[in-house]
């Protein structure tokens, strides 16, 4: 098949998932055309069946805000027309599904059929989509997509509730390449006996970074640990300032990385205290690296992180509950090791080899 994938090119979960999906589809013999405003951070173009098409938005002084959706739609039409594309798979409803629908209509006038599959990732529904400015456009985009998928049952239910839509939504969870993480685990050697607690995110307010830093501070006062924070975003400088003011020891703000598995393999506990989280791809990658998981109980996280089995779930703003959960693991090597092993077993259920065929089946259903 010849497939267009439209995604955000950033370190966020939707862009990472879309990129890894494209890589695996190419390995399976499909031709994959990525469209975005810049090259996705994890995109590897070494495979001759992967192509990247940049969306350029020409500046025109009449517009206070340059029309990205129009430029994206035009690029989709151009790529689809020149490459005999079978379908388009958009990740994140706004503006991608909306732009895909406009492109679909333009192509129809040239007697070219372009079916749309839209994957909902979370904040496109729970935050952006609920905003009055965007709600009608999001609902329209969902209803006009040929197939809609979501990354968790929680997100599926939220979508039906928020938008009062009867659109059928198929749950296809996020995935992880277990083989890649296994290879890293085999090479990984702990440098010392100090336990490491890690967080990975895009440092947006929804990730609840300020609560995280307060949790780290209380743990630091009671236990000798390392604290790793991977990622960048709007709350990063606030987090650094808080860590300095609270005099947290052994904390490392590591920035963005394309090789998160090299950090996670040295980690023991992963914490994700998000205010809302449709799935928690970062937590899944930590599970594949044999980390016990401490997370909030919001959104799709309880579907992934099974309380008292792979880790603990807490109310998102309950600092004391997070601290208590972490200390239970730090003071019981037996419990920590059991949770780490359970996490790894849970991650295997989400192996890329199990999940990508689910997308392929939907593609075949679209073009049959």
Briefly describe each language-model feature range:
Residues 61-87, 97-98, 102, 132-136, ...:
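An amphipathic, basic-hydrophobic alpha-helix
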Residues 256, 275:
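Aromatic "clamp/platform" in nucleotide-sugar-dependent glycosyltransferases that forms part
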Residues 149, 190-216, 228:
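Conserved donor-binding/catalytic core segment of Leloir-type glycosyltransferases
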Residues 307-308, 312-319, 328-333:
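Conserved acidic donor-binding segment of nucleotide-sugar-dependent glycosyltransferases
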Residues 321, 328, 335-349, 358-361:
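A short, well-ordered alpha-helix in the C-terminal region of glycosyltransferases
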Residues 292-295, 305:
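Short hydrophobic beta-strand element within catalytic cores of glycosyltransferases
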Residues 154, 175:
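Carbohydrate-associated surface elements
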Residues 5-11, 18, 23-68:
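N-terminal strand-loop element at the rim of the active site
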């Amino acid at each position: 098949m010849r497939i267009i994938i439209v995604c955000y090119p950033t370190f966020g979960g939707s862009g990472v998932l879309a990129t890894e999906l494209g890589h695996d589809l190419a390995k399976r013999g499909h031709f994959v055309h990525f469209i975005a405003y810049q090259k996705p951070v994890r995109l590897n173009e070494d495979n001759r069946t992967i192509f990247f098409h940049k969306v350029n938005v020409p500046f025109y002084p009449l517009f206070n805000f340059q029309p990205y959706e129009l430029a994206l739609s035009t690029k989709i039409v151009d790529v689809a027309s020149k490459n005999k594309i079978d379908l388009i798979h958009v990740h994140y409803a706004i503006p991608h599904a909306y732009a895909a629908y406009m492109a679909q209509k333009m192509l129809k006038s040239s007697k070219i059929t372009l079916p749309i599959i839209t994957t909902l990732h979370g904040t496109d529904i729970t935050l952006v989509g609920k905003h009055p400015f965007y709600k009608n456009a999001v609902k329209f985009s969902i209803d006009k997509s040929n197939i809609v998928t979501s990354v968790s049952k929680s997100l599926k239910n939220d979508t039906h509730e928020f938008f009062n839509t009867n659109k059928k939504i198929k749950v296809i969870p996020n995935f992880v390449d277990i083989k890649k993480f296994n290879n890293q685990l085999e090479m990984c050697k702990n440098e010392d006996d100090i336990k490491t607690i890690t967080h990975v995110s895009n440092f947006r307010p929804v990730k609840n970074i300020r609560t995280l830093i307060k949790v780290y501070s209380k743990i630091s006062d009671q236990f000798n640990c390392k604290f790793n924070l991977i990622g960048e975003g709007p709350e990063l400088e606030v987090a650094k300032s808080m860590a300095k003011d609270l005099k947290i020891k052994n904390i490392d703000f590591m920035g963005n990385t394309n090789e998160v598995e090299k950090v996670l393999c040295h980690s023991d506990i992963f914490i994700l205290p998000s205010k809302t989280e449709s799935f928690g791809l970062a937590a899944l990658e930590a599970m594949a690296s044999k980390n016990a998981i401490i997370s909030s109980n919001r959104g799709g996280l309880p579907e992934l992180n099974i309380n008292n089995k792979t880790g603990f779930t807490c109310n998102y703003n309950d600092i004391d509950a997070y601290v208590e959960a972490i200390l239970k693991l730090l003071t019981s090597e037996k419990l920590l090791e059991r949770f780490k092993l359970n996490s790894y077993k849970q991650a295997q259920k989400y192996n890329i080899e199990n999940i990508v065929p689910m997308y392929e089946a939907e593609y075949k259903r679209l073009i049959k």
